[in-house]
Each structure stands twice: as structure tokens, then as C-alpha cells.
Amino acid sequence: MWTEEAGATAEAQESGIRNKSSSSSQIPVVGVVTEDDEAQDVFKPMDLNRVIKLLEETDKDGLEEKQLKFVKKLVQCYQNGLPLRDLAQIFKILNLCSGKIKNQPRFIESAYDIIKLCGLPFLKKKVSDEITYAEDTANSIALLGDLMKIPSSELRIQICKCIVDFYHAEPPKKHIPGYQQASSSYKIQMAEVGGLAKTMVQSMTLLENQLVEKLWVLKVLQHLSTSEVNCTIMMKAQAASGICTHLNDPDPSGQLLFRSSEILWNLLEKSSKEEVIQQLSNLECLLALKEVFKNLFMRGFSHYDRQLRNDILVITTIIAQNPEAPMIECGFTKDLILFATFNEVKSQNLLVKGLKLSNSYEDFELKKLLFNVIVILCKDLPTVQLLIDGKVILALFTYVKKPEKQKIIDWSAAQHEELQLHAIATLSSVAPLLIEEYMSCQGNARVLAFLEWCESEDPFFSHGNSFHGTGGRGNKFAQMRYSLRLLRAVVYLEDETVNKDLCEKGTIQQMIGIFKNIISKPNEKEEAIVLEIQSDILLILSGLCENHIQRKEIFGTEGVDIVLHVMKTDPRKLQSGLGYNVLLFSTLDSIWCCILGCYPSEDYFLEKEGIFLLLDLLALNQKKFCNLILGIMVEFCDNPKTAAHVNAWQGKKDQTAASLLIKLWRKEEKELGVKRDKNGKIIDTKKPLFTSFQEEQKIIPLPANCPSIAVMDVSENIRAKIYAILGKLDFENLPGLSAEDFVTLCIIHRYLDFKIGEIWNEIYEEIKLEKLRPVTTDKKALEAITTASENIGKMVASLQSDIIESQACQDMQNEQKVYAKIQATHKQRELANKSWEDFLARTSNAKTLKKAKSLQEKAIEASRYHKRPQNAIFHQTHIKGLNTTVPSGGVVTVESTPARLVGGPLVDTDIALKKLPIRGGALQRVKAVKIVDAPKKSIPT
């Protein structure tokens, strides 16, 4: 409360310093309100500078009492909050008081009271005060951490309470006119800026044996660690290792372990995880974690203890990811393996004797966390022997079996299913490292039997309510998925003993059967999981069949059928992101490993138009598939039946395979930055195949066993494969090529010559760099090779020019033909238009009609034969009573010779025996059948 005494004192102070001050604006003041002034909203200033000056004075009688009195009145004045404008001076007063504590213990109370004020709201007079006084506020709050050095338990606890109050801001007890409370997060932000977290971490070293104060500091750090800025500051102050090493300190309340674990959690989440792990990866920290975990594992029975135990295990798992962490040296790895397997494998170790996990949520989570930590630990190879000693493989295999009826299970059905999936996933990581243990436990037989159950129609209701159970609700997809993943991991060890055992147990046939069963029952709902299962099956088959003809024969036509089924997938699905790309990669891998090299399978693949499907995929222009598809085609071209299939293929717009391959070559060269002109012609005949990368790289001397840049270029792009395919198809007989294709084909045809020239050129340049002088004959040979390579380039460039010129001429001729057609079309249109105009003129103008008729008659008359044949019948062209305004068309109906003259229908059809009448008209019957010689005189027709 603002008191009358405080008001009177303030007035006295004001009158006392009036003559010393040059202006009132230079005096930092705070409004001191008396009971009378409060009603009038009038503030009385208090001279804080005088208080500071008073505290700085020494060696005066009664000075201590006076100083304490002024500080007490100061506390009374600010009991409703601290104005930001006065904060710097108030904390200076606090600092002066704390400096006197050592010689004048009575100042502890004054410092305590001022610190208590810091828990009150900060007040601002203007909105801009938060920004204006930000630096002063940050420095003032940072001073709280420095005051932790004062050896006063009461003072330290009050400092901690004050900081905790930052996170639980309360409104002012009383409204002060003209002031408003600073934002609730202002103190927290200023604590971050001032670096309070660092001094609080450092204060931990002063509290080794002072539990109460240590717990308060941990509470403060717990609040501070909710901020990323503070976590970074704490991490740099080595907070992680400092807190972790004291986890085992005696604490009946249990707060130390709880608060410490939460601080470690926050540091791992909100600061540099790698740096925090590095701080915790020392023997002292791991020993502390080990002891805490063992105590909680063996003696923790409450929900709180079990949850804390799991948190410690998660932190340990994160530390175990660091290969430099001495997990084995401190014995933690051995204990974790024991705790992970004691439920499944009996152990006489005293640590687990009489222990049993319940089916509570915390113990269930613990079991999964222990499986997870085994996966992390097995990445450190020295751990392998401990895994063998702990019989981890045997313990995990206890879950790889179908559910048994009438058996008492410690876990619920859902829990057992999740643990089963987790165990199989763990085996996928551990089994490849412990392959001998895996085989001794009959691992292949167990997994194949479990897969057989997964494929069966046995009733089983899966819950699918976990990460590993994703996509497996109401079916066995999750179990099948992880079992196949385990088999894939084992197969890809390429251990012949393991793979032979799998093949003898009929794995190839079983995998093909599972695949066929899956594709016969489409499941769109779980499509992503099904695609992963299919991919794993194909990868397992590839691993088993590679380099084994007999196994490829077992793969046979049924295997080819499933491969072809995948290759017929709608290309649009390749962009769906559901795993079709992975499935297609697996399919192409299975073609390489399971079909190529086995002639019956190759022939069946060709018979079923497999090459067409490969070329269809190649035409999709997916760069990630091109290299693999072309490699497969190179091998397939060794089969004499392949060329006919390749040449018979047609893509969009009747594109041929040769045209497609040449197009891919051009695209590859464009991406590689090979120099070509606009027509695709060689520019640099000395370096016709050089890429932009080769241009940038300088030739350096290399050991004989290191491939040069020119050699590496062969394997790093698809040009060599395209050359090999076109070479096997015969360069001279490639159908469906354009002139542009032929220009590119000239380069492809000489690819090997150019590449040999490149390599010799590198050899020559290396000799120069090493300053070697070859003998005369070698030098001449090198020069001859270089010249020959350049001449080949010039020859190819010349041939390309001829092709381009020939095509240009052909294009010119084609253009002229098209132009001639256009001219003829235009001329025909003009004639048609003129004819139409004439027709309109005749039908609309009588004079024009008469003129046209006159011209027609003249034309008819001019076309007649003027010498009339003897005995010929003359037909009139004019028919009486007929009026027409148009000329006759191409079809004219004419009344011929009357029937009386014809003599009836033609009875005899053997015209060759008849004598034709010379009078014209229709055929007539003649009586004589005697054949006479034709008259020798000429008869007009």
C-alpha cells in the first residue's frame, strides 16, 4: 500500500534536493501516492538517485540504519509493481544491498524484499516503454542469476520463486493511474535476451549438497527449458552433462529425477541434438543413467515410476545412436539386452530373478522400447557377441508364430500383435548380423511357416493399431509385410548356405504363389502395403535366382507371368507415389536376375511381347528407369529372336525402336552438354563426344588401376548401351528413321572409334604432363592414332553435311510439289468460278443464252464428219417441243433404232460367229452363218 509516511518522506526528499537539481526532468522519479493524493490522482516523485548515493556512502555514524530505512520505504513505494523506467536504478540498489551482505548481514532482508518485488508485474507508462527500456530490463533480470552466488539459502530460494513467477504472471494488486501492466511474456523474453539461463546453470555447481536449493534451481531450469533460445544457452553452458551426472543424488521427494529428465528431454528437442548427445556420451553420465534405470526397473511399481523409467530409456536410446558412447564399457548394453529378453528366455541373473512384466500400458511401452534399443545397439559391431550371449534371436523368434489357441498369454491380443510385428521388425536388423544364430534357430523354416499362415484363410482379426500394424487392420498384411522384409534382409547377405536352404524349402515357388494370390484379390484400400509386399517378393526372388541357372528354371514361366503382369501397369500410376516406382524397379531387377541367361524363360518373355512392354516403359522417358531398361535390352539382344521383336515395335505416331533410341541419345547429349550445332552435327572433330564435365576437368596423371574420365564416362551415361543395342540390330537396316535420326546415327555408329580416340588422347596428355619423352616410334604411333581419330570425326561431319544437304534438297522438291498442287487447286477453283458465272449469265440474260446456243451449235457442226456414210441412219439433234436452257450432261438418254428394225431381243450371244451389220444401230439376226472374208475396202466409222 502507498502509505502516508512514504508520502511525507517523499515530500521531505523533494524539498531537500530541490536546490541541487538543475531540472526536475533529470531526476528519475516514481509516483508515490498518499491516501490524500490517491483520491486526486496526483503522483509524488521519489529520488532514486539519492537512495543510490546514500547506499554508496561509508564510514558515517548511523548510516546503516538510515540506509535500511530508505530501502524499506522504497519497497513500500513499489509494492504494486515496478515501472520499467525505474527498473535499472532499482536493480542497482539491489546490487548495492547484496554487496553489503557479507559485512552487514542485516542487508539480506533488504535484498530479499527487493527480489520479492521482482515477482510483481512490470509497469509501463507508454506503449513504447517495453522497447525503450528493453536493454535495461534484460540486464536487470540477468542480475538475478548473478545473485545466486550469495551464500544465503533464503535469498536463493526467493530468486528462484521470483523467476518461476515470470511464467505465472498475475495482474497488479491495485491499479495505478497512468500505468499499465507490461505484456505477460515480456519478462520471459527479457530473461532470454539477458542470458539468465546460463547463470542459473552455473549456479548448480554451488549447490552440490543443498538439496532444497538444488530442487528450486531445477524447477527454474525446467521452466526456462521450454524456450528454444534458453535451451541453446543451457546447452552451451554444458547443462546436459551437469544435470545428468547428478541423477542419482539422494532425493526422498523424487523431484530431482523428474525435473532433471524433463530438462534433458527439452534440451534434446529444442537445441542441437547432436551436441547434447555428445555431452551425455561420457562414462559418468551413462553410469548415472544405468543406475537410475536399473533402480526404476527393479523397484519402480507406481505408474509414475514406470513412466519415468520409460523416459530414461528413451533418453538412453537417443544417446546409444552415438557410436562413440561407451555403452558397452559401462555395462549398460549387457543390462539392456538382459531386460529385453528375460521374459522369453530364462535367465539366472539376480537382476531379473523374480521379475515379471505386467500387461500395463507402461510395461507394454517398455517392451517396445527395449526392442527398439536392440536395433540401435546392434549397429555397433562389438555388441554382436553380447547379442549372441543374450540369445536375442531365440527370444525374438518366440513371437514369429501363428496365435495358439487355449494358451495363457500375458499380453492382450492387440498388445501381442503389436509386439509380434515389432519383434519381426527387430529381427530384420539383428538377423543379418547373427546369421549363424539365425540358422541354428531354424530361422528360414520358422519364417516360411509363418508366411504360409499369413497366406492361409485361417480366421484372424488383426487390430492394426500401431506404427508397424499400419494397413493391417482386419487382415494379415502387416505380418506378411514384415516377414518378407526379414527374408529380404537375410537373402541379400548373399550367403550361399542360407539361400540354398531357402531354395530347398521351396521358397521360390512359395513366393510366386503368394504374389499370384495377391494380384488375384485386388485391395485398393491397402494398395501401398500390397505394393511393398510385391516389391519385396520380387527382390527376394532376384536375390535367390541371380547367377543360378537351375533356380532361374524353377522361376520359369510362372515367374515370367507375374513380371509381365507388373509391366502392364498403367503408366499414369507411376506418378501416384504409392510405391509403383519401387515395384517397377524390383520388376526390372527380377528380369535381370531371374530371366536373362535362361533361354526358355527368355523365349517365353519374348513370346509374351515382353520386349514391347520394355520399349513402352522406355518411351515414357523416365530417366530413373532408362539405364536399367537399356542394360536389360543389351543382354536380351544376345538372343537372336530379339531383333525381330525390337524392329516390330511401334510407339506413338508410329515411332520405331531405333528412332526412340536415337532420340534418347540426343536427349542424353543435351543434358551432358555435348557440343552440337542446330542440326545435330559435330562441331569439334577432335573431341566429338566430350561432355561439359569433361571440358571442365583437367587431365591429371592417374595410377594404372584408376579409370580415367573418358573411361568413367562410358558407365555414367546411357550412350554406350544405346550403341550396343543399335549395333546388335545392325546399323544399316534400321527402319523408320528421319534425316535428323540419320545425322545422329552417324555419330552413334562411330562411338567406339571416338571413345578409343579420347582415351589415347588422355594417354598422350598424361605423358606430356609427366614430362616423359616417348621413343620416336611410339610418338609417331600416338600422333597417327590422334590424326586418325580426328579424320574419322571429319569424315563423319562430312557425311552428316551430305545428309543434311540431301534432306534440304528433298524438302525443296517436296515444297515445290506441294506448291504445284496448290496452284492447280487455285486454277481449278478459278475455272469453276468462271463456269458458275457463265451459268448465271445464261440463266439471267436471254442474249447471252442465245449467244451460248449459237456457239454450241457451231461447235456441234464443227465436230461433225461431213462425208456421210452410205446407208447410215441420221439422227436429228433437235427435238421438237423441247425447251432447255442448259447443255446436256455426261449422261444422255437417247431413243435408238425402233424395235421393228432390231428384230426382237438378241437370242444368240455367240457374237464371234455373227457378222456385224454395217448400217449401224442395234445388232440384227442374220440368216447366213457362213464366214466370208472381210471386204478389203475401208469402211468409215
From Swiss-Prot:
Pfam families referenced in this protein's UniProt entry, alphabetically: CFA69_ARM_rpt (PF21049)
Biological-process GO terms, alphabetical: flagellated sperm motility; olfactory behavior; positive regulation of fertilization; positive regulation of flagellated sperm motility; response to odorant; sensory perception of smell; sperm axoneme assembly
Function: Cilium- and flagellum-associated protein. In the olfactory epithelium, regulates the speed of activation and termination of the odor response and thus contributes to the robustness of olfactory transduction pathways. Required for sperm flagellum assembly and stability.
Primary location group: other
Annotated protein name in UniProt: Cilia- and flagella-associated protein 69
Compositional bias (Polar residues): 16-26
Species name: Homo sapiens (Human)
Subcellular location: Cell projection, Cilium; Cell projection, Cilium, Flagellum
